[in-house]
């Protein structure tokens, strides 16, 4: 029987990436070392990583005329199923200008988040849930995404344990509307930015302070850059993995998406939370030593 897919729901962006010797001063002109187009967006990047790791995966997000040919071709080149894409007749596919500092790998992003509508609960109603073993949702239009998550919950109540879809949610941006998503999903990824916005100064403090927001039995995960990542589960056991920095950091764009995808992949393969956390940090660390995603495995 064909292996079920992992579905990632969220954003796809055209990233125009300029690699520079050092970050430019305002009102200056510099030459870049190189420039490339790259398919970006959190859910889109996570699909790239899942596919590179060997997982059958699909992307669901909104797309519109514009840079679509490049983006769709790149999804297909990576073996990512785009049959769930919500095609929009109005608006433009988002794009971003990304500047990567070659001296330290830091990335600065200027996003043109266009008027393109996000995937709606109505769009999600058309999805055949039986195709998927795991669905990951990048927090965006939370009120609609709650309806999507409730649909998955309803579907799962009618399934035997081995057929239930596992669900993960990413709360990355410090926006109040997104915080309702904490209450959904078997695995919830909360970002360092959100944790600091809510007053926490470490991953462990964030997990202990926010765990009361997640559903019974869920695992809350927080990556903290060079300090590694922590996870907290229902038995109050804290897991930790150190970071695995590369010999030289060259490109951190998409490192968080790489971490999330690697944790999801590992858990979907039946690994323990400790193993998944370590694997996520290892793959994300390797990615930081590479331009783009090729070579992470």
UniProtKB/Swiss-Prot annotation:
Keyword Nucleus: no
Description of activity control: Requires potassium. Inhibition by ADP.
Keyword check for DNA-binding: no
Binding-site residues, ATP: 107, 225-228, 254-257
InterPro entries the record matches: Ketohexokinase-related, KHK, PfkB_dom, Ribokinase-like
Catalytic activities: beta-D-fructose + ATP = beta-D-fructose 1-phosphate + ADP + H(+)
Subunit structure: Homodimer.
Protein task: Catalyzes the phosphorylation of the ketose sugar fructose to fructose-1-phosphate.
Protein name: Ketohexokinase
Gene that produces this protein: KHK
